[in-house]
């Protein structure tokens, strides 16, 4: 696993406002946001501690080290490495796989203490590795609503070779100057021991930024131990072997670390041990510790300061109100800047006192005294229940997760704790591609959704495939309400479930809410299509009537294409039958939703009817009866464009604005788009057109047309290596055979010579052994370009007689090969039985002319995927076969979830699974047969092969509750995709 410095969960850094140092929490979470940390003035020790720290000069350094060695040897048996997955995005936390540390605090009950940001607020699965490398599953039994600690539970009877012991918690031993050790899983290592000295006991909780988890209303302990990712949850121990604090965070630019005091942990542990509820009270107010001089400036009277300094001689400040949540118990009572004097008559100087009173007063009325403007102000306030305003359930629908807005999120902006929070803005509710967090839903389908239950009731009434209006806002900008239309997808994302936390089992139980409602009938719509603003050419102006925008939404990764919405210009090929041609970068396969829009007024569904394996175009079909608009079938040219020809570019800019420009062809060349790091569809073996116009670089799609309105070429965008976009023209003559077959009511099929080609100069051809008579023939017959076509690669095949890299193509079936399109393949229909035919190639290989019979092949598109352990598996698609010389298995990994078991245990994208439990898995059928026999929550052995043919093996534990095995298969007759659940929990 890659180790990064993050929130001491291997975590992300955050910037300190005053010291300009970045803070981190110490575990293995590589996906957290960054922000600032408030740094205060150094204070003295707590008021009940002795200021003078004795210096032990009587013991030698040797004796001290020996004592530490003895202590550490005992402590390490209580420390565990936690490997975990936060399964689903929830509240402030993203879905992730990570590592952290914990330590045993009750060996009999099997209770492990770790951080709250490790346990997480949402679904969790994990296991603990003990000092002797025994492993045991852990379940979460408590996560504090505010403070950064939680408890995991394991079954001690499952451990056979180690006798675990618990660390004793003694928070009172934490003193300034004390030498400590942090024993944990630092930087992802099995065991690290870091030393340091406590420098502060009264630091405010570090602030890790907005829209992420932050502790508050507690003091933190500060020390210099230089802990890093993976040490979250480590015990901070004294030389006597007592745990005095819990490692939580630190600075990534300094050696400073932040520890959580254990006072509230001790109380919570006692409640768990005695099977009592852990009550947590709140008045929905955040307090911060401020020094006396600042308190005076905020309104603390001199008498109150004098009294506080006398009563708490070790303290240098008091608690001041920082944020009061609207509609909370203290709203319109406490004000920002108020200095807290007492609660129920008890003078207050620390957060621990506040927690003690609130936690024991849930539902009761308390009397609070604050100072404001040098005057005492007293009021009564009813203590609320923190657990009630902490979400314990969420809804999954349309590929997104929702729950009630949490106290944790609302506190950042002093908002009321209410509303429907979007935990994962994905699927239908991908509200803003640039911002994925912080969204709150206000209205759906013109119905208000103030609570999660209201949201559920509204979603129950919405049919599949309906477009509804959603009003929403972001927590960072509550003044701005945004409006968008959402396509309700209940066919790709069929689940409509509610998950509820079960603290007894540690599992989030789910139940199905309702089945999807069938789609409503689509009614024809009318639209006006405006002419292009070309006053001197009415025929060109009418070309807008043949153009549309094709929209695609990919629901699941297939062929290594990530699920995301795309759109681009389409050309109507046949207005009566509804055929539209579009770049394959917008329609990469047919496991998606496709729509066609006209004049930015009508949007109708479409289906994929043809995908060209190499030429980078797709053809979709919509129902023309649904479009009441003057859509026109254009005239396609019969002659090819040549270099120097004048033409007109008409295309859609990235904003979907239609523009046009006079231009000319400045080149026609051969092109194969370079491979991506992860193989995916790419255009190969094309004859492409380039034009003399900068406007083409601003348009991802369009057409080239003659002055009389005849379409000469399709302007396409191709995805290349490292997300680079290639823009080029494809002559319409190259697509006419396919178009004619479709217009005739048949299904086109293409059979190709499956190899990679490129052009070489006559000089290179002569050097590599092409006979002079062939060079002379090329010079005589070629008019525009003098070149030969050479083989650059050979796709994976079992056919023995094949082209080899370096071959120079002289002729095919006796015809001189002058350009790439001369070896473009055979176009036919699905009725043709001989579409895969043999072609007679004459090539130069190793400076010798030889004849080859090369069989053309049909490229099969993907029709089946399997999701196992959160990993999407399929047969290797064509892009993989184009670059591989051997295929180890037909079980190929194209994607894995950010919280998946596949990621946790080490299945990489582009791996091949060759064996499961030592049984060969040459194909998906065999793979499914084997994994069906693997019980839930058990280990299986996987043997894999990397893309570079390096074999390795891993073990993986199944979890069918969160990661079921699912098959998605295309029905060859209807073209629809059917989901089948393979595993049962």
UniProtKB/Swiss-Prot annotation:
Region described as Serine protease: spans on this chain: 79-269
Molecular-function GO terms, alphabetical: serine-type endopeptidase activity
InterPro entries reported for this sequence: PDZ, PDZ-like_dom, PDZ_6, PDZ_sf, Peptidase_S1_PA, Peptidase_S1_PA_chymotrypsin, Peptidase_S1C
Residues covered by the PDZ domain: 287-385, 771-847
Enzyme class: hydrolase
Reported function: Nuclear serine protease which mediates apoptosis.
Protein name per Swiss-Prot or TrEMBL: Pro-apoptotic serine protease NMA111
């Amino acid at each position: 696993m890659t180790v990064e410095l993050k929130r001491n969960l291997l975590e992300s850094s955050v910037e300190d406002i005053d010291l300009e140092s970045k803070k981190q929490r110490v575990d293995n979470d590589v996906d957290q946001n960054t922000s600032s940390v408030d740094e205060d003035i150094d204070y003295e020790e707590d008021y009940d501690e002795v200021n003078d720290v004795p210096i032990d000069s009587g013991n030698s350094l040797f004796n001290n080290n020996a004592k530490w060695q003895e202590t550490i040897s005992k402590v390490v048996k209580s420390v565990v490495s936690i490997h975990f997955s936060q399964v689903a995005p929830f509240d402030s936390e993203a879905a992730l796989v990570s590592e952290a540390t914990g330590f045993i605090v009750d060996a009999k009950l099997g209770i492990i203490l770790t951080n709250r940001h490790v346990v997480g607020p949402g679904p969790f699965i994990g296991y603990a590795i003990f000092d002797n490398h025994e492993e045991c599953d852990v379940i979460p039994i408590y996560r504090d609503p505010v403070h950064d600690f939680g408890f995991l539970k394991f079954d001690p009877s499952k451990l056979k070779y180690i006798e675990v012991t618990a660390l004793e918690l003694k928070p009172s031993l934490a003193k300034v100057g004390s030498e400590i050790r942090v024993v944990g899983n630092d930087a992802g290592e099995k065991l690290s021991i870091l030393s340091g000295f406590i420098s502060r006991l009264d630091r405010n909780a570090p602030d890790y930024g907005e829209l992420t988890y932050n502790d508050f209303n507690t003091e933190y302990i500060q020390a210099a131990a230089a802990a890093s990712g993976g040490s979250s949850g480590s015990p901070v121990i004294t030389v006597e072997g007592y745990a005095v604090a819990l490692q939580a965070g630190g600075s990534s630019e300094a050696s400073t670390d932040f520890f959580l005091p254990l006072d509230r942990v001790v109380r919570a542990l006692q409640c768990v041990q005695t099977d009592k509820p852990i009550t947590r009270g709140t008045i929905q107010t955040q307090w911060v510790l401020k020094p006396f001089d600042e308190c005076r400036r905020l309104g603390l009277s001199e008498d109150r300061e004098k009294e506080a300094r006398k009563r708490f001689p070790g303290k240098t400040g008091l608690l001041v109100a920082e944020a009061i949540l609207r509609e909370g118990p203290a709203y319109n009572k406490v004000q920002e800047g108020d200095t807290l004097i007492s609660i129920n008559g008890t003078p207050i100087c620390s957060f621990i006192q506040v927690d003690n009173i609130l936690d024991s007063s849930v539902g009761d009325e308390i009397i609070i005294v604050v100072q404001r403007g040098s005057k005492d102000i007293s009021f009564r306030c009813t203590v609320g229940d923190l657990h009630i305003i902490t979400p314990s359930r969420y809804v999954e629908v349309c590929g997104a997760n929702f729950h009630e807005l949490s106290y944790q999120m609302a506190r950042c902006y002093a908002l009321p704790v209410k509303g429907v929070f979007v935990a994962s803005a994905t699927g239908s509710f991908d509200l803003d591609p640039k911002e994925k967090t912080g969204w709150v839903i206000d209205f759906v389908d013109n119905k208000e959704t103030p609570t999660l239950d209201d949201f559920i009731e509204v979603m129950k009434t919405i049919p599949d495939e309906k477009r509804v209006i959603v009003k929403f806002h972001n927590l960072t900008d509550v003044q701005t309400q945004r409006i968008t239309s959402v396509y309700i997808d209940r066919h790709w994302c069929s689940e409509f479930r509610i998950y509820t936390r079960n603290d007894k089992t540690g599992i989030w139980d789910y139940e199905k809410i309702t089945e999807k409602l069938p789609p409503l009938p689509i009614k024809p719509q009318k639209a006006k299509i405006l002419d292009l603003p070309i006053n001197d050419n009415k025929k060109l102006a009418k070309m807008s009537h043949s153009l549309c925008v094709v929209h695609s939404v990919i629901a699941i990764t297939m062929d290594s294409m990530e699920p995301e919405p795309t759109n681009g210009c389409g050309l109507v090929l046949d207005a009566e039958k509804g055929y539209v041609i579009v770049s394959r970068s917008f329609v990469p396969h047919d496991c998606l939703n496709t729509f066609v829009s006209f004049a930015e007024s009508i949007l109708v569904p479409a289906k994929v009817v043809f995908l060209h394996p190499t030429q980078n175009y797709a053809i979709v079909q919509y129902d023309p009866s649904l479009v009441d608009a003057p859509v026109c079938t254009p005239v396609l040219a019969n002659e090819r464009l040549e270099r120097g020809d004048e033409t007109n570019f008409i295309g859609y800019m990235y904003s979907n604005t239609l523009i046009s420009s006079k231009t000319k062809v400045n080149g026609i060349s051969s092109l194969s788009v370079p491979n991506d790091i992860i193989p995916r569809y790419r255009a190969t073996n094309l004859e492409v057109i380039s034009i003399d116009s900068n406007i083409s670089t601003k348009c991802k799609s369009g057409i080239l047309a003659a002055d009389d309105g005849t379409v000469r070429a399709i302007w396409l965008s191709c995805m290349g290596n490292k997300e680079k976009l290639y823009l080029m023209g494809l002559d319409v003559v190259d697509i006419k055979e396919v178009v004619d077959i479709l217009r005739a009511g048949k299904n086109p099929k293409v059979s190709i010579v499956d190899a990679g080609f490129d052009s070489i100069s006559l000089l290179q051809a002569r050097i590599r052994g092409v006979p002079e008579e062939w060079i002379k023939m090329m010079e005589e017959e070629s008019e525009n370009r003098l070149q030969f076509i050479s083989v650059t690669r050979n796709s994976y095949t079992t056919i023995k007689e094949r082209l080899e890299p370096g071959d120079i193509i002289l002729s095919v079936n006796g015809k001189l090969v002058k350009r790439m399109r001369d070896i473009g393949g055979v176009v036919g229909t699905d009725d043709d039985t001989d579409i895969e035919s043999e072609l007679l190639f004459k090539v130069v290989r190793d400076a010798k002319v030889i004849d080859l019979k090369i069989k053309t092949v049909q490229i099969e598109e993907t029709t089946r995927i399997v999701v196992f352990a959160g990993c999407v598996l399929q047969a290797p698609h064509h892009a993989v076969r184009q670059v591989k010389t051997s295929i180890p298995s037909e079980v190929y990994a194209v994607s894995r979830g950010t919280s998946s078991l596949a990621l946790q245990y080490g299945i990489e994208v582009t791996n091949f699974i060759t064996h499961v439990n030592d049984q060969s898995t040459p194909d998906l059928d065999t793979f499914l047969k084997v994994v069906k026999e693997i019980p839930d929550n058990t280990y299986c052995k996987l043997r894999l092969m990397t893309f570079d043919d390096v074999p390795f093996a891993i073990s993986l534990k199944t979890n069918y509750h969160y990661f079921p095995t699912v098959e998605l298969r295309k029905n060859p007759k209807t073209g629809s995709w059917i989901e089948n659940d393979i595993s049962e929990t």
